[in-house]
């Protein structure tokens, strides 16, 4: 009779230098030799801007079948997974799903909360992809995997609604063998304005009910630094936001760039608008998708405040004295695409978030000026928007807008800093309190810090050391044995960490290549230093985005150059002066663009 063993491996999420790309696999083999595997999350990581890639994803070649989009051949997975559990709808946890489907990967059956399920299904529909199989699960639901594994869903709190943790219990000889709690991203400190909040009682109960000889918990390490700010809470965040609006009564256009899926933070704008007795407009495709997913999931918390017409009618509505536009683009999506693709005179139709269009003065309806107050409530995070975020805000300020921002990892342009929202992740104090209670319930608990770079994971270890909780630090692709009362590194051949990354290519006079108007997405295999190894395939973009109907991309280049402290790449200085062939190509591109825009009038980017 074989010896049972439970193995945990992180395909992404414990990276060497930045947060994201979260993905883990639990594999269990019982004494009869039955093996089952399950996966948790499949997210994206924001790659450094200088890499030329937009984002990267964990390499799942071992776990998913793939149908090559070029020749149609099916490549079988060597270690197929039975199910994929999704903790929540943020990009660093689900961001690979659409792109891997485009690359030909066959996704396994998925399990997710109502909101996460609805959001993913809507996202696939907007990309013209087949709607994936996703089973809705809620706290307390138990999913059986084969004859030797089960997974129970647990409510947790985060900045996105309907977040779940998953408690996996494996069996050997019909008795519990090992348990692993995957919290996803979570916080414990306050009541959430929308949906369910973290329940200590429920959380501790699952550990007590389903005790195992070896129990491990994966801990979100994003905000466990000892110098992290104290949380101000939802009510204070609303107070601070409202006070800034009231201090600037001469500015009747309020613009708030947000992370579209962070519903708990969008609720700050919604409550501020209620106090102002005004309506908000949700501008951006993904914000509208989030609203639709909320309604499908039974959340109508914002409906009394959200304007029901078009943005044109909203801006022209004289009954609304102070306009409040909540827009996509807190991470300046699209600005990096512009820098990677467009030369001085190019007119490529690059998809841009609503906030970036405003910064470039390319938004068809919203024009910034001295009447505008920009509430940059999402803090600057160096690993995500450390370059593009400050550029976007400074470009907005150059148009006359006043910018107020939440303090982050860097100050920008001398803008006033006011704490207008909290991190969506548990801080050091709250984690220490929670894990002390977990240890009281499960004395042999072992912590595995994840969702952080090595320094952040060390901070979590320091917290655990203070309360006597054993900790095991790990890295991507290290195989961990969970059993015999401990977590140990398994002895197995180690392969180098690699990712699949994507970049977008748009029509550009500076490349000798014909590119469709909507552009191409190239998929590459890259190493852990974000250097390209090989090109995998390229896919034509869904014909949904188009260039703004007013303004010129030529002016965008000048705006970037003029804004303060804005480094830009040397390749972007080139012009077509003196090059008749290049000038002709640019002219032809402009004519083609005008023709296509007339055909697509009224359709704007994400």
Report the location of each language-model feature:
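Hard-cation-handling environments
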Residues: 229-377, 382, 390-392, 397-399, ...
